[in-house]
Amino acid sequence: MKKSNEDKNYENVKAFLIARVSDPSQREALPAQERRLNEYADKLKLNGELHSFDETAYKEDRVKFVEIVKNASEYPQDFIMVFDKIDRLTRDVSSDVVRTLKNLVKEGRAELHFPSYGLVYHQQSPAHDKTRLDMGMVFGGYYSAAISDNVKRKIEQKLSVGEWPGKACIGYKNVKYTVDRNELK
């Protein structure tokens, strides 16, 4: 790809548009991502190929995404990979797929675009753009870890006051009760 990204002509450049959510319960967020990705591709006149799926951001369960990156890396021409936001790429800075994509960018074969952040990561990206990408991945990882910590604290709190932290096991009844001052109902 060109050395500078200023006023670049992207017309008909192959673009892999990635809309991803972490699990099936978040699927309602996919249409909004898809719309933003398609609008971005239309604006730049990209030859966009939309991939939309639910798959965790953790490396063991990224079968679809790894396959897309493999296909993109074998693509014979330069290409762009577009994610709505950085955390749709990954929350793990050290993952193999991130390393692969960053190497493709270093070679000048790929660019990573994040339209919601106005970030285009390319071979000649300045230090502040590289840092924005890395910080976005770090903060995505932090967000995920913080949610996990909050869930653990909530479970500990429920157990400390004698509440079961979820539904009863199979074979037991889920009985709701209320506490009114000192009286159990």
Where are the regions a protein language model picked out?
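Coupling/hinge elements of helicase-like and P-loop NTPase modules
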Residues: K3-E6, A145-L184
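Charged, glycine/proline-rich intrinsically disordered loops and linkers
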Residues: Y121-H128, Y177-K185
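Short, structured surface patches at the beginning of a domain
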Residues: M1-Q157
